[in-house]
UniProtKB/Swiss-Prot annotation:
One of its GO terms (molecular function) is phosphotransferase activity, alcohol group as acceptor. CDD domains: ASKHA_NBD_ANMK. SUPFAM superfamilies: Actin-like ATPase domain (SSF53067). Catalyzes the specific phosphorylation of 1,6-anhydro-N-acetylmuramic acid (anhMurNAc) with the simultaneous cleavage of the 1,6-anhydro ring, generating MurNAc-6-P. Is required for the utilization of anhMurNAc either imported from the medium or derived from its own cell wall murein, and thus plays a role in cell wall recycling. Keywords: ATP-binding, Carbohydrate metabolism, Kinase, Nucleotide-binding, Transferase. It catalyses: 1,6-anhydro-N-acetyl-beta-muramate + ATP + H2O = N-acetyl-D-muramate 6-phosphate + ADP + H(+). The lineage of its organism: Bacteria, Pseudomonadati, Pseudomonadota, Gammaproteobacteria, Pseudomonadales. It comes from Pseudomonas syringae pv. syringae (strain B728a). This is Anhydro-N-acetylmuramic acid kinase. InterPro entries: Anhydro_N_Ac-Mur_kinase (IPR005338), ATPase_NBD (IPR043129).
Length: 364
């Protein structure tokens, strides 16, 4: 039977909200999309909630209502554009907005008010995907490797899927064993934070500013000495660890560098932590498929290819899947798994003690 789902993803980069319409039968097909740029005031509020501050509970409650109403408007626009009505959609899979992720302390917090979203859209909402995995001893992240396996596993060995959003994560796909995966470290988060602090730009288009600088090996080695990079998976991370303050802490201990050299070094950090992780976990990788915003960073993609000379590095576009929409598609698929009672976590990815059905259901 064919079902229609909507997936909603707002990642750690906080740049906007991705909404994807999916047709789900024996495979997942992307039908339509809608993108909402994050309003500046809401971006600032959400970024502030990612670190300790005053009156956090009230601020989070207000921010998630604003976020939710934006999503509801986006869903309605998407349906209108497709001449569809809410009754045709089986469910919305809403990731929400992560404001804290500390699985070592037993929690990951995504705000988004799924009850209000169900009320505003008149569509069943599935949300809160991470906490069941954490309850079972897992990291609660990354959750997309199971979807990567479903989407890109055509019985070819030695394939990996790399998602580069605010943070980077790998899915290792082999035909004879369950998918494996983990967070590698910062993706765009440090690159975006540094260029914002220096040039007041939201991101480094094509990695051009990074490409104009030179890597400082001393700073790079200091950054690579972080305990996260020395830890084997399963592992996940977030803004609690990697943020502008983390960069400035290491810069304080270094010689004065040109801003573009810092950016070049941060790009090298992203590239090296990805490729070193891949070589360690899957020594032979014939094909690396890249999705997420980082797939558009030409300097980063070029560096990945240089560091992996025996691996074909390409965008998921090669499979006819737009790299910008893979995560939103994944949460539509996760909603489908929840309603079908299909476990969607992978213990080989998160470290949970078993497979679990993920998500909480808010009926229309």
């Amino acid at each position: 039977m064919d079902f229609f789902y909507i997936g909603v993803m707002s990642g750690s980069s906080l740049d906007g909200i991705d909404i994807a319409l999916l047709k789900q039968d024996d495979r997942s097909r992307l039908l339509a999309t809608h993108y909402i740029p994050m309003p500046e005031d809401l971006h600032a509020e959400l970024l502030g909630l990612c670190s300790s501050g005053a009156d956090e509970l009230a601020r989070a409650a207000i921010a998630e209502q604003k976020w939710c109403r934006l999503v509801a408007q986006g869903v309605q626009t998407l349906l209108q554009d497709q001449n569809m009505v809410p009754a045709q959609i089986r469910a919305i899979g809403s990731h929400g907005q992560t404001i804290r992720h500390e699985p070592s302390r037993g929690y990951s917090i995504q705000i988004g008010n799924p009850a209000l979203l169900a009320e505003l859209t008149e569509i069943t909402v599935v949300s809160d995907f991470r906490r069941r995995d954490i309850a079972a001893g897992g990291q609660g992240a990354p959750l997309v490797p199971a979807f990567h396996e479903a989407l890109f596993d055509d019985n070819k060995d030695h394939r990996a899927v790399l998602n580069i959003g605010g943070f980077s994560n790998l899915s290792l796909i082999e035909s004879d064993r369950p998918v494996e995966g983990f967070d590698c470290g910062p993706g765009n988060v440090l690159l975006d934070a540094w260029i914002s602090s220096q040039l007041h730009e939201s991101y480094d288009k094509d990695g051009a500013w990074s490409a104009s600088g030179k890597v400082d090996s001393a700073l790079l080695q200091k950054l690579l000495s972080d305990q996260f990079f020395l830890t084997k998976g399963p592992k996940s991370t977030g803004r609690e660890v990697f943020n502008l303050g983390w960069v400035k802490h290491h810069l304080f201990q270094s010689k004065t560098l040109a801003p573009e050299d810092v950016q070049a070094t941060l790009l090298e950090l992203t590239a090296l932590t990805i490729t070193d992780s891949l070589k360690s976990a899957q020594p032979i990788t014939r094909e690396l498929l890249v999705c997420g915003g980082g797939a558009h960073n030409k300097a980063l993609m070029k560096r990945l290819a240089e560091l992996l000379p025996d691996t074909e590095v390409s965008s998921t576009e090669k499979f006819g899947v737009n790299p910008d929409w893979v995560e939103a598609m994944a949460f539509a698929w996760l909603a489908h798994c929840c309603l079908e009672g299909v476990p969607a976590n992978r213990p080989t990815v998160t470290g949970a003690k078993g497979r679990r059905v993920l998500g909480a259901i808010y009926p229309a």
